[in-house]
Amino acid sequence: MKTKPFSQAALSLAIALALSACAAPKANPNLTLEATGQVMSTAETAERYDVNGNWWEIYQSPQLNALMEQALANNVDLKQAAISVNKALYQANILGADLVPSFSGSLGANASKNLKTGSHGNTFSSQLGLSYELDLWRKLSATADAQVWEYQATHEDMANTRLTLINNVADAYFNIAYLNEAIELAQKSLKQYQEINRIANAKFRYGRADSSQPTQAKQSLLSAENSLLSLQNNLDTQKQVLRNLLNLRPSENMAADPAQFRLLPVKGVNLDVPITVLANRPDLRAAEYRLQASQQSVNAQKRSWYPSITLGASLSTSSDKAKSTFNIPMLGGSATINLPFLNWQTMKWKD
């Protein structure tokens, strides 16, 4: 770096700051797709319809509410999705920092001694620097915007994970509730078949029926027993599915006793909803955001071939005495032009 007179260095610094204000628009964290007017936005959907994210609460079931609360607190997939959101936000903040000037500073002290003459000397120095890459082609902005889109996509991923978890827990609850009632009916039916089998055998013993009646009664009884056994096996499977969704250890209990699950009254569903609201599904929105992120990444990669200009300024001092280190500052400025297209053999493999 060459040392320049104070006025020239100050002028370079002023130009750098002025260009930074013009050439570095911030990445917009509120980028949306509703500007096209082709889909109904989330805000419009919420305004026109009664959108309740905790829809299961309309059933007013303490067991179902307790299960949902436990699932949302314990589920591993939901926690991993939250971590992904934080990582994407962290990366977006890092890339956004490239749009503003970066500062650096240092303090140094050096001591030396001549072993032959015994003389020694001390040197003290300090430096304050500023560096800024002009975003002339909006390469940095495109890179930052791509990460903002990715951050929004991870938000939708978490919303989709939450929605999937809620639906799976609700399915497991209603499956268990159905199986509980089906098993109760199957047990009552089994008792009836047992009584029919007893009567058929008694008739056969007293000669009031041929051998086919006890045989048919036994077959019906075995069929009822098999049906009951199948329902019980399905119930055990659904209970294990629910435990997995709740992320429970073998020693932990569910927030509600599955034996108490019962089918709930059917609630009315508003069917007068336009199909355009499907565009607000979290998985679809995540896919749309990632398409936008890919487009911005392509733009940034194309613009990486263009020349880049980096401006720098520094304020440095040096003295052989600590108390006079800051007495005689020297101001310097620099401008660096990078020509990446000259390294085309490497750049072409990155596209």
Protein language model annotation of sequence segments:
Residues 3, 140, 156-273:
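Periplasmic alpha-helical coiled-coil/stalk elements that build and connect Gram-negative outer-membrane
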Residues 104-133, 139, 143-149, 154-157:
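Outer membrane beta-barrel translocator domains of Type V secretion systems
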Residues 79-97, 106-110, 292:
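Short, acidic/charged, Gly/Pro-enriched secondary-structure junctions
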Residues 2-15, 19-73, 232-279:
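Terminal intrinsically disordered/low-complexity segments used for targeting and assembly
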Residues 80, 96, 134-162, 212, ...:
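Sec/SRP-type N-terminal targeting helices
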Residues 57, 63, 72-74, 94, ...:
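Amphipathic alpha-helical coiled-coil scaffold segments and their short linker/junction regions
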Residues 50-59, 69, 106-129, 252-270, ...:
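Small/polar, glycine/serine/threonine/aspartate-rich low-complexity segments that form flexible
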